[in-house]
């Protein structure tokens, strides 16, 4: 299992330089990958393209970029450019976002979201493979469209998928999933078997499973969880995440956080590896002085 570092999920970053420096520091520490959330700040695909120019080894990915605001050809072109800028180290993570954002803020219809994602991928995937796309659906119609971006070959696409319909789409058409607010029991009983079954039925190889979890190395786990609960409370109010927390049988985001000493963290991460998570994506919560640095250092010892 690879070890990733999530950027932007537990709070805002102060500057573009800060984010790029975090990626450089993660690479220097030995972390395998860095994944950036695309929320209401810097554009994640663009930022990782910049980070790719000043790093050499670390894998880069979005976790995740919403689909609705951008035509699949536009996001394909931007993502392939970032893949080229990073020397082929970029994975495009896409997702639906949430109804409150897509309908309430942006004014798009959020009706039949899984159908939207299926159509989106039917346009996107041929384009990222360097093929000419011809597709006619309810939402997207594309004719004789192709992209040529030298140096971008082999870029993978993962989809934030939680419900059965989305997991089916991700397994059939994409290269895996990127989860958030999903506990280990739900990962083992629902996410991974559903995704693998869909991939197998479509004749695809075992998909990537990138599991995002809040994490902190601390000798005060109860106090840390209190702080994490304050940081992440909003996630527990969003219906798709709430459904996963309910399935896990927990009250809120802090209850799936991994907080404790080295032995506890190591055990929880190895548990996730044993059930099929391919990348542990660490959302390090800076809940006490020095917390981020020592947690990243510990995670780096598990990488590779």
Describe each region flagged by the PLM:
Residues 1-304:
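Active-site-adjacent structural elements that line small-molecule/cofactor binding pockets in enzymes
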């Amino acid at each position: 299992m690879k070890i990733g570092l999530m950027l932007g999920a537990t709070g805002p970053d102060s500057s573009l330089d800060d984010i790029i420096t975090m990626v450089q520091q993660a690479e220097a520490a030995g972390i395998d990958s860095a994944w950036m959330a695309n929320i209401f700040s810097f554009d994640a695909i663009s930022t990782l393209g910049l980070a790719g120019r000043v790093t050499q080894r670390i894998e880069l990915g979005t976790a995740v970029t919403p689909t609705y605001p951008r035509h699949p050809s536009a996001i394909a072109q931007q993502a392939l450019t970032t893949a080229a800028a990073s020397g082929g180290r970029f994975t495009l993570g896409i997702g639906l976002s949430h109804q409150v954002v897509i309908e309430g803020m942006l004014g798009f219809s959020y009706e039949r979201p899984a159908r939207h994602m299926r159509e989106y991928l039917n346009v996107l995937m041929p384009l990222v493979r360097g093929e000419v796309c011809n597709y006619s659906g309810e939402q997207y119609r594309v004719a004789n469209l192709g992209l040529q971006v030298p140096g971008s070959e082999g870029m993978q696409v993962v989809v934030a998928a939680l419900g059965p319909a989305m997991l089916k789409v991700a397994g059939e058409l994409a290269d895996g999933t990127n989860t958030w607010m999903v506990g280990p029991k739900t990962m083992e009983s629902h996410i991974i078997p559903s995704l693998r079954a869909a991939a197998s039925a479509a004749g695809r190889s075992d998909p990537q499973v990138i599991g995002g979890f809040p994490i902190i190395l601390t000798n005060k786990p109860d106090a840390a969880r209190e702080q994490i609960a304050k940081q992440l409370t909003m996630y527990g109010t969003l219906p798709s995440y709430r459904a996963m927390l309910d399935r896990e049988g927990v009250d809120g985001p802090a209850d799936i956080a991994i907080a404790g000493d080295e032995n506890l963290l190591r055990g929880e991460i190895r548990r996730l590896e044993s059930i099929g998570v391919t990348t542990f994506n660490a959302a390090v919560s800076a809940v006490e002085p020095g917390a981020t640095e020592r947690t990243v250092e510990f995670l780096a010892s598990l990488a590779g």
